[in-house]
Amino acid sequence: MAATNGDAELTVAEEAKEEEEATDDGGGGVSSQWLRAAVLGASDGLVSTAALMLGIGAARPADARAVLLSGLAGLVAGACSMAIGEYVSVHVQLDVELADLERRRRRGGPAPAGLGLHAAAAAVSRPGQAAAASALSFAAGAALPLLAAWFVAGAYRVRVVVVVATASLALAAFGAAGARLGRAPGGRAGLRVVVGGLLAMAATYGVMKLFRTHGV
């Protein structure tokens, strides 16, 4: 008899739990994966929102309101995009693994040992939870440069310095934290993340500055 969808989901979850217990000592458990995903989501939100604010500021340096509203719009849009993408991804991954499990059982073969922690642990019957986690991590990262600029009263150059400094410090912390979760040295990883974020912000700022210079 073919396995029902509920039985298949239960089996996938049980196998994921066994794999988690086997790999937890090596830093590859589900908890570590969730934390690393949260760090990546926060870094994504931080870089994209800071770059967006700097870009709008380069085009309209005298309009502080436009800069803040662009950051807020980036936070909301990015969080929604992350949530929807994670929700769809989780369902697709789960459907693929459940279909593979059922095909193996119909052929009378053994169930695969370790179907994938992402779909099994994070998505079985809880795609909404995975979507919410992605949205919240993105929003948390995006809120940092937005709040930094919000509470700064001064010239545009001052806001730029504050946003870049806040983003750099936070990126260094996120990069180091992600490396530590994988039991790797955090210093070099943090530096790489900071350099990447600064390049993204500089590119956005430069392009928008070019458009403003040419009167576009």
Curated annotation (Swiss-Prot):
Keywords: Ion transport, Iron, Iron transport, Membrane, Transmembrane, Transmembrane helix, Transport, Vacuole. Residues 1-29 are annotated as: Disordered. GO terms for molecular function: iron ion transmembrane transporter activity; manganese ion transmembrane transporter activity. This is Vacuolar iron transporter homolog 4. InterPro entries: Ccc1_fam. Probable vacuolar iron transporter that may be involved in the regulation of iron distribution throughout the plant. Residues 1-36, 87-134, 179-190 are cytoplasmic.
